[in-house]
């Protein structure tokens, strides 16, 4: 049964990064009781009076909460309500004490004063002409924003985006909404086509309008990118756009063909089919193919025999023939791929290549896609290694796009670039890396092709190997190691599609769970036994799961382990405490922290969270606090590029969609010393037997082969 609740927002417990879900505490206007409310939308302001519509439900972990189907900002009426609203910090020039003085002077008529005769605020001690002007301008801005919010909320647009729209366009907001609404897709990060389309239609845009149709086509291409595709077949794009916009396919085809003819929508022809791109991905695929082909004509540097002998002598080892071959090819080729699983000698080979490069007085630069992968590369090579983003001096623009300062105009100075964990690079990052190489520079890509594909579009490492023109060194011989041999042996079994088994040394163990709750209990027991809450284990151990949702999903595991670590219940699903292990969710170039970086919370106050990362401290305040998440548990995808002494990997039949060989292989190989697999025979069998056969729409390989035409 739907109920209405009115009250004042007292505290935001959780606000999702995309502004689509929040949990907050509400002080009920009638009972004055504090209650929990959940809303699928952006979080309201603390101190804001709101009217909620919804129903009560019992959350399995957090108890009774009011599930809002609608949230409406309302004007404060009672004096206490007004005081909380004014003291919230929304209005510039008014703090808690000033709010009290204003309400003491005007009582329940305070908001009437703000609306109709704001000059009367001069009667309040402490408000002079300058302060009044500040209050007046700030309140007027809030009024305009609130009016816009109410209009957009009626169309299902979240408050967060309404605020962003108002900040971006100011006095021109109405003009943009009425005459050029689709520019908001480009201008407002995170605001999607469907939300903008609702605004446009409400403002009278013709459903058959060609501008609307072309933006719909772009939206469908962008959706393909989210599935890992770099482009999409014209026919499927037109069909899906027709269904999305509820217009005939003929209308879509006419608008689409016109946009393609005028090169507004880039396209490539391959095998008698046309594939459509967004401009940035078109440039990435076509230009990357040209650059790679041009790099194939590199002049050999000479024999690496002396360098190999020097390396073997200094390190008291003998390189395998395949490793020696790789060192020589690195000195001969413009582009080289080195691929192999754990224990096959990739790290040793990188060090040998560095020695050979120095023989020829060549400067070397080491990179990796993630911070943890770069740190591992640095430790194993004895040389500094950076993330690719840091090496290319990436900056985030207001539009949400990334600009790389290192490019054709200001390339990297080094002669040989070595990229580890190269299988993680999508085609866009790969392209920007190629743009940053100076004339004559050599590129060596090191990676494990059997791991998960990139999160972003394309799979350039796989395509380079498939092309057959780039020299590829496959390291297959497993060198015996004192630690982790049980992990390496089982990883090899998985890679070949065979079942994995526990080893006698206990480096690879399997807990066979009878149910999802049994698996959850096993995770918690192992965390207790291994003392996950200790400072040492927090960073050397990791719990992994394929998915965020579910009893054994990352979200639930994180909260449960957090409570285990602290020894008491923790309020809210995103409440941080000193000592918590956290992960940065997106690249922040100003702070110098990157997607996947792990840190420890060392202090928390009312509005700030202080996190220690390796070698630096970062402060999060305001909306920045949504840039981190608990990291006691993480997805296998997020762990790629990282290694830990101990890994607990959960893999269950209920996670069926994720049960694939490369995911199991990637999860298992994150551990150096000990892997604990919590699973069932059926889930393991399904995972090892199911290869990721889903092909991605990408024309990088046909473009390399010269088979595709612009």
Describe each region flagged by the PLM.
Residues 352, 356, 360-362, 368-380, ...:
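Conserved helicase motor core of SF1/SF2 NTP-dependent helicases
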Residues 496, 597-710:
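C-terminal accessory regions
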Residues 449-591, 602:
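Conserved helicase motor core of P-loop NTPases
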